[in-house]
C-alpha cells in the first residue's frame, strides 16, 4: 500500500542502500548504535523541540528552554542561526541544501542522513563533507540492508523521522514547530525548489500524510504548545 501510494521503486531503494553501504565503508563511519547512544545521552529525559520544514516554521518565534535540545528537519536547521548555544541534531536527506547540516555540525551537533532512491546519485559529490562528519554522522536508508554502517529510522519525511528519533531516544516531552503535516504547501526549508509558501507536489503531500499516521501511532506521549486538537497539527 505504501509503495504504490508514494510511488516508491523498491529496486531503486535497494540500490540506494547498496550505495549507502559503500559510502559508509569508504569513509569509515562509526557504528551507528554507538552514535545513537551518544545522542541518547543528549536527548533522554529532556524536552525536545522537533522543528519541521513547514510554512509555520518561518512564522514561529522559537523560545527554547535552557537544558533542552532541538532535532531539526533538513533546511529547518538553518533557523538555528537565530538561537544561542543549543544542542541540535539534523535529520536530513539534504534536499534543503548541505549548509543547514554544516551549521549543526559546526555547533557540535549530530547529522542523521537519509539516503534513498531520489538522492543517492548525488551522495558521491559530498564525500568530503561526509568524511569530515564521520564521527558524528548516522547514515540511514528506506529499506533494511545488511550493513554494519547503516541503520533505519521509520518515516517518509525528515520531520516524522525527527519525531520518531526524539521519541525513541527517550525525550521527556516533544514540542513540534513547523510540523505542518496537514498542509498542502511547502517551503525552501524542505527543498530548494520551493519558495516561502509554495504548493507542494502530490508526492510530498502524500508523504506528509503518511508522516502524520506514523506520528499518530506514537500519540500517547505527543505534547504540543502550538495548536490544540489531535496531534496538535
Segments (PLM) and residue ranges:
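Internal, active-site/partner-interface "lid" segment
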Residues: 143-145, 179, 187-194
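Glycine-rich anion-binding loop/nest that anchors nucleotide
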Residues: 50-55, 158, 173-187
Amino acid at each position: 500500500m505504501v509503495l504504490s501510494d508514494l510511488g516508491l521503486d523498491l529496486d531503486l531503494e535497494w540500490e540506494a542502500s547498496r550505495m549507502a553501504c559503500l559510502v559508509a565503508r569508504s569513509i569509515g563511519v562509526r557504528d551507528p548504535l554507538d552514535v545513537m547512544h551518544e545522542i541518547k545521552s543528549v536527548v533522554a529525559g529532556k524536552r525536545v523541540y522537533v522543528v519541521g520544514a513547514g510554512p509555520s516554521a518561518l512564522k514561529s518565534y522559537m523560545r527554547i528552554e535552557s537544558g533542552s535540545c532541538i532535532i531539526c528537519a533538513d533546511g529547518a536547521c538553518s533557523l538555528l542561526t537565530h538561537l544561542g548555544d543549543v544542542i541540535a541534531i539534523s535529520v536530513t536527506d539534504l534536499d534543503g541544501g548541505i549548509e543547514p547540516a554544516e551549521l549543526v555540525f559546526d555547533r557540535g551537533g549530530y547529522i542523521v542522513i537519509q539516503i534513498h532512491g531520489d538522492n543517492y546519485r548525488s551522495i558521491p559529490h559530498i564525500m568530503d563533507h561526509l568524511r569530515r562528519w564521520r564521527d558524528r554522522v548516522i547514515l540511514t536508508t528506506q529499506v533494511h540492508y545488511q550493513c554494519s554502517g547503516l541503520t533505519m529510522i521509520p518515516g517518509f519525511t525528515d520531520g516524522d523521522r525527527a519525531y520518531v528519533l526524539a521519541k525513541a531516544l527517550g525525550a521527556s516531552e516533544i514540542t513540534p514547530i513547523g510540523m505542518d503535516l496537514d498542509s498542502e504547501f511547502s517551503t525552501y526549508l524542505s527543498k530548494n525548489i520551493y519558495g516561502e509558501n509554495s504548493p507542494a507536489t502530490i508526492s510530498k503531500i502524500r508523504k506528509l500524510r503518511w508522516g502524520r499516521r506514523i506520528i499518530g501511532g506514537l500519540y500517547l506521549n505527543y505534547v504540543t504548545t502550538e495548536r490544540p486538537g489531535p496531534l496538535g497539527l
